[in-house]
Amino acid sequence: MTTEDTQYAHQPVMLEEVLDMWFSQSEGFYVDGTFGRGGHSRALLSRLGENGRLIGIDRDPQAIAAGQQLAASDSRFHMMAGRFDCLPQAVEQAGRPIDGLLLDLGVSSPQLDDAARGFSFLRDGPLDMRMDPTQGESVAEWLSYAAEKDIANVLYRYGEERKSRWIAKRICETRKEQPITRTLQLADLIESVLGRNEQGKHPATRSFQALRIHINGELDALDQVLEQSLETLAIGGRLAIISFHSLEDRIVKLFIRDHSGRAPKGRGGLPLGDELPQRLEPVGKVMRASKAELKVNVRSRSAVLRIAEKVA
Ligand SMILES: C[S@@+](CC[C@H](N)C(=O)[O-])C[C@H]1O[C@@H](n2cnc3c(N)ncnc32)[C@H](O)[C@@H]1O
């Protein structure tokens, strides 16, 4: 283990549930689209046979390094760098359809805990929030020029922040005096607009979530990979998705419903009266972390796991 691994560890969420409900073919081909520190991948490898294959994908340089280390010690595993919607390339490389795709969405504990990554409203650091800091612009860069109305829209859409307009206004007033470049500077600004008292929740929680989702194009990547999964999964292959907030979970829930022949007519982009081709079947009920897991892993509190199988 490297110093970074021990300093910023990540505890995989709902590990047993994922393996029990998602993994079935010991010689199968699996993709972990959100490798992180490989908690789910390592557990999967421990059940995978000699001819089984696993591809890990992540866009974060530290996660990629951890994956490459694993790949060097296990020939059944291969690490790919990039957004998880590079899924078709992964499948092309393997030359066979996938038996399972896992997405454990959002950020990892190492990303949140390392102040230098700029994700945390509790630790001071540069206001960045990019999962891949080599691509695109940081939150600080975006906030330096974005229109007040666009900032308010992002806070409202991705954070469900009711006072989004007030916060956006304060950001635009403040940046005339000084650039907003630090995480605590933004957290304090939001607190000065909303006040402190929010039933144990930091007032900046929703805004930080919104800015992170926006700057990383998270929901767009999710939409894309869900569509790709229909073409890349083998019949009988399973999709397992762990979401951490209602926006993500809603996208996953509607996607499964709209491809399982259960969409109300006129929904899911289909003309009224059209029959839906059934391509996915939900597996079991929506799952949440067990009481035992909640006690030892606070991150599992908001986790929601959905599994679906490709049936046609
Ligand atoms: C919750 S963590 C996954 C943790 C992992 N299951 C484990 O047990 O270590 C999410 C990971 O997915 C990555 N990620 C999130 N969205 C991504 C995307 N669109 N493309 C590629 N990686 C993404 C993040 O960089 C992060 O490392």
From Swiss-Prot:
Any one cellular-component term (Gene Ontology): cytoplasm
First-tier enzyme category under EC: transferase
* Amino-acid positions noted as binding S-adenosyl-L-methionine in the UniProt annotation, renumbered to this chain: G38, G39, H40, D58, F84, D104, Q111
Q: Name one Pfam family in it.
A: Methyltransf_5
Any single biological process term in GO: rRNA base methylation
Give UniProt keywords alphabetically. Cytoplasm, Methyltransferase, rRNA processing, S-adenosyl-L-methionine, Transferase
Q: Which SUPFAM superfamilies match?
A: Putative methyltransferase TM0872, insert domain, S-adenosyl-L-methionine-dependent methyltransferases
What is a single molecular function from GO for this protein? rRNA (cytosine-N4-)-methyltransferase activity
The EC code for this enzyme is: 2.1.1.199
Where does the record say this protein resides? Cytoplasm
Enumerate the catalysed reactions.
Answer: cytidine(1402) in 16S rRNA + S-adenosyl-L-methionine = N(4)-methylcytidine(1402) in 16S rRNA + S-adenosyl-L-homocysteine + H(+)
Which coarse location class describes where this protein primarily resides?
cytoplasm
Family designation: Belongs to the methyltransferase superfamily. RsmH family.
Q: What does this protein do?
A: Specifically methylates the N4 position of cytidine in position 1402 (C1402) of 16S rRNA.
**PANTHER family recorded:** 12S RRNA N4-METHYLCYTIDINE METHYLTRANSFERASE (PTHR11265:SF0), S-ADENOSYL-METHYLTRANSFERASE MRAW (PTHR11265)
Recorded protein name is: Ribosomal RNA small subunit methyltransferase H
Instruction: Write down the species.
Output: Alcanivorax borkumensis (strain ATCC 700651 / DSM 11573 / NCIMB 13689 / SK2)
